[in-house]
């Protein structure tokens, strides 16, 4: 299966990236673009999280509920974004048209890839080993890792977002990181014209 963009990871940053990309697929410059997300949430930091300090979330919100609700929201609003579940990414390797993504079940090809996995060890995805460094904004005792990047870009067509991009483990920061990458990709598709996607309240 071939994609124009494939997101790897279904946590905060990955799902937020998918939602913003999905909202942009109806734009003229994104017509016929194919987007997908490989959702492997079992290792997500959200599983045991409780939120009281996130704008827009009611106090006492469980991270495990957000994981479920995020998938439902993406499917309901932007069904064009393919959700691939119960697959674990094994390799991300250069391909003549972008990247080949290998999971424990399938092989995919994408022009652009977004790494949105968590920052815990071990990180054993083949093809990304040379980009792994100690996390710059985490407690060294925990031995967290990140991928070398400049403003989320690792190299042409390869992005990262959230904690794996070097962000602190904070919900709002991770979400913003994912949204930032999505708008960078939409901008790229829009011939470099800076792009964002806003919905507006209807006026009666």
Identify the residue ranges that each predicted region occupies:
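Short hydrophobic core segments
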Residues: 6-8, 107-121, 158
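A conserved FAD-binding loop/helix module that cradles the flavin
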Residues: 25, 161-202
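Glycine-rich beta-alpha-beta "Rossmann" dinucleotide-binding loop(s) and their flanking helix/strand
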Residues: 111-143
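FAD-binding beta-loop-beta segment adjacent to the flavin cofactor pocket
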Residues: 130, 136-159, 166
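Extreme N-terminal leader/targeting segments of oxidoreductases
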Residues: 1-4, 66-68, 73, 135-139, ...
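N-terminal Rossmann-like dinucleotide/flavin-binding domain of flavoprotein oxidoreductases
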Residues: 49-107
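Beta1-alpha1 glycine-rich phosphate/pyrophosphate-binding loop at the start
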Residues: 3, 7, 12-68
